[in-house]
Structure formats: C-alpha cells, structure tokens
Amino acid sequence: MKAVYFICNNHEWGHVSWRVWDILAEEGFLAESAGFLFCGQDVKRYSDGAHEYFFVPTDLALCLDYPRFLPGMLEHFADADMSGMVTWHEGGNAPDNVLTVHSLGDMASGNYGLANPRYMRNLLLAFERNREELGLDAYHVTTEATHWSGVHDGHGDPSLLVQFPVPMVDIEVGSAPESWDDDTACRALARTLIHVFDDDGKTVHNLLCVGGVHFEPNFAEAALTSWGDEAYGVTHCLANQWLVSGEYENEDGFRKACACVDSIAGGIEAIVMHDKTKGCYKDLARRLGAHYDVPVYKHQRLRSPETMEFRKSK
C-alpha cells in the first residue's frame, strides 16, 4: 500500500506543518530520497517493509495553489491508496487543543474529494493512541465538517478537487497559537502518518452524516466508536451551516448530496441526520436513503449501534 502526505516545510509560512516535517526528519522518516522532485523540492520516501510512505515538501499549503501542484500530484501519486495534507486549524469559535482529521469537499459547488472511511478511521485511532502515549491529556481527537480551503477569499476552482483520484484528508492541530506551537502535539501528528494502514480488522459501517455544527460531537464520537467486531466509518459530514448556504433543499442540492455519497469508497450503509436539522434537510436525508436504499437514523441512535440496521448502498 502507498500513502502520500503533502507538508509545507517553509518556516516562513504557516504553522504546524513545518514542525511536523522537522519531527519526521528528527525521527528518521525522511532519510531516503524518493528520487524525484516535486515543484523543485526533493520528495522523501519511507518504507516499513509492508507499505511505503511519500513525504512531499511544499512552500505553502497544498490547497492554496492547487493549479500549480495538481500536475505533479497526478504525475507521481495518482496510484496512491491514501493521501493527506498536514496543516493547522483556526477559527473564531473553534475549540482549542484539538487533533483533527477531516474529509475534503466544497459543499457550495458539490465537489467532493474521494473519501476512504477505513483509512480515515485508522488515522483517527492512531492519533488517539499517540495522544495517550505522549501524555496530551488536554487534547482530544476529533473529526469535523467536510470542507476544503482551496476556495478562499472568493477565489479558487473547486472542480480541481475531484481531479485527484486518491482519497485525501486534512490532518491538523488546532486551534490557537499555543497549540500550533506545541511540539508534542505536532509529534503526535507526525507519528500518526505512518499508521494509516494499521487496521484492527473490524467491520466498518460507512455513514453519511447530515446536519450538526462544524465540530459536531455526536459525529466525532461516532468516528471513534466500536462495538464487538464492528465500527462506524465516518468521513463526509454535511454541516448545517453549509446545507443552508448551499441551498441543499433545492433539486440541485440533491444532486450535490448524491455526489457526496458517490465519493465515499465502498458506498454507505446508513445515513445519520442531526435531530435539530431543519425539516427540509431531514427530507433530503430521507430522499437520499430511498435513493441508495439505506436506512436513515436520527443522531441519537449512534449511542446504540447494536440496534441499528446497516445495508450497503445500491
């Protein structure tokens, strides 16, 4: 299996990512050159004997100059099994001391990056193990609403996101400067990257999550939940704020929501909607359930997984 991570190693730009790059170098993961350049910088390769990992240095966050980076991504990494961008999280109302992994998509346009629930779950579980091992008791591991920073300040082409044929996630530390500068938190992130293919063998039931807030605790908890030999697979989460701004109550909203479902590897087995979601978006969830022939549940059912029926989407 092959994973690739895009990491800004420019100390003069941004947060978290260059610290992660330096930690990867310190711990010996960047000792081998991959033998080619990406936008003028030497790509690094690490193998654990079973899988290989490519670490790609960039001069700024990948999403902020996708037109420049995409040709190299397609040339060198179109055959990868999983990919990720290392960055930081910030926001006026964002929680602090978070270690996050989230799927990519532009809800306004309905362009969704490919998502792999099993690999994303592996990253979240590895992040949690590293959080515990490094004594990061003040932090918590979470996912968040699906979004993409490739559209910013009113500029950007979200259709570029779907041109990279590899599942991708953002992997972040947030959300305040004290967290960005926390070497231990960045070390937890760095060590997580080489465990994306570590698998506990559980049966993963893929969900589409509809509604809720950006850091929706019910969906975040589900992403780390397992029972017996089963677990939830959480990737795309369609936050309420962007359902509204994207006008998902309209016919075009159904098209965009279908594009979201179709981007999830293996399809979905259930739809979970936040109970406080407006009626028109609950109707959307039910329509999607009928279209894909999967059950639709309110978010409270996530607490009783043994009572849920799962059915692979058609």
Question: Residue spans of the language-model regions?
Answer:
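N-terminal catalytic or cofactor-binding beta/alpha core of small enzyme domains
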Residues: 1-165, 176-177, 183-187, 194-219, ...
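Acidic, Ser/Thr-rich peripheral helices and adjacent loops at domain boundaries
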Residues: 223-241
